[in-house]
Structure formats: C-alpha cells, structure tokens
Amino acid sequence: MVFKMMYSEAILDYANSKKFRGKLDDATVIEEGKNISCGDEITLYLKVEDGVVKDAKFEGMGCVISQASASLMLERIIGERVEEIFSLIEEAEKMSRGENFDEGKLKNVTLMSDIKNYPARVKCFILAWKTLKEALKKISRP
C-alpha cells in the first residue's frame, strides 16, 4: 500500500524535521529547484570548503516525500567530498528507478527505497537530488 511506505513514522519524522531547514548566511552555493507537475519547491544552501560539504540547509514546501528526501539527503552529504556526492546522487537515481544500487553508500536514504514502486512520486523524491547536482555543478564537475 502506498501510504505504508510513503508515510511511515521515520519518513514523517524526516519530512517534519527542522534540523536541516533554514538558510545559510555563509553558503558557498544556493540552488533552487521546482517540480512543476506537483508544486514541490526547494532551495538548497551549501557551504563547501576544500571540496567538502561542511554544512547544508534547505527551505522548501511540498509533499512529505520531497521534504523527507531533502532532509535525508542533507543528513547523508554533510561531511562528504563533492566528488563522492556526485556518486551518491547517481546511487539515489538508480534506487528511484528500481535498478541495483549500493545500499551502503546511501545509508538512511534507503528508507525511501520503495519509491521505485510509485512512479508518479519519483519526481517528488528526486527533486532534492537533482537540485543538489545542479548546485554542485556550479563549483565542480562530475
């Protein structure tokens, strides 16, 4: 059932979490992303020093899936090298398409692995990841 995966307690907790919400005044890069088909919006703020994401926040509005995905993503990337993050984005994309992916790399992001079973919601999940990819392209090459 769609509601079991998408609205599990853990996913609701991530969607409602304030831990990664807000702006970063000292952000290295800011990127906006929108899902025009459903109205989800996100603005990512990344602080990158010496090729490592030191801090990250987001502002956004949208469904539980898009907001939980953004929180899980930021939890996963803080402390990682930009080069490794491009690889994480690729793994998240594979997961969303139902392809083989490295669960160990994605860690808690795998809470949303059932998204592959709900094609209409994949765009909601992937919005944060696509926005992250565009942000990182501004400061590095994949």
UniProtKB/Swiss-Prot annotation:
One of its GO terms (biological process) is iron-sulfur cluster assembly. Pfam families: NifU_N (PF01592). It comes from the Bacteria. One of its GO terms (cellular component) is cytoplasm. One of its GO terms (molecular function) is 2 iron, 2 sulfur cluster binding. InterPro entries: NIF_FeS_clus_asmbl_NifU_N (IPR002871). Forms a heterotetramer with IscS; each subunit of the IscS dimer contacts an IscU monomer. A scaffold on which IscS assembles Fe-S clusters. Subsequently gives the nascent cluster to other proteins. It is likely that Fe-S cluster coordination is flexible as the role of this complex is to build and then hand off Fe-S clusters. Belongs to the NifU family. This is Iron-sulfur cluster assembly scaffold protein IscU.
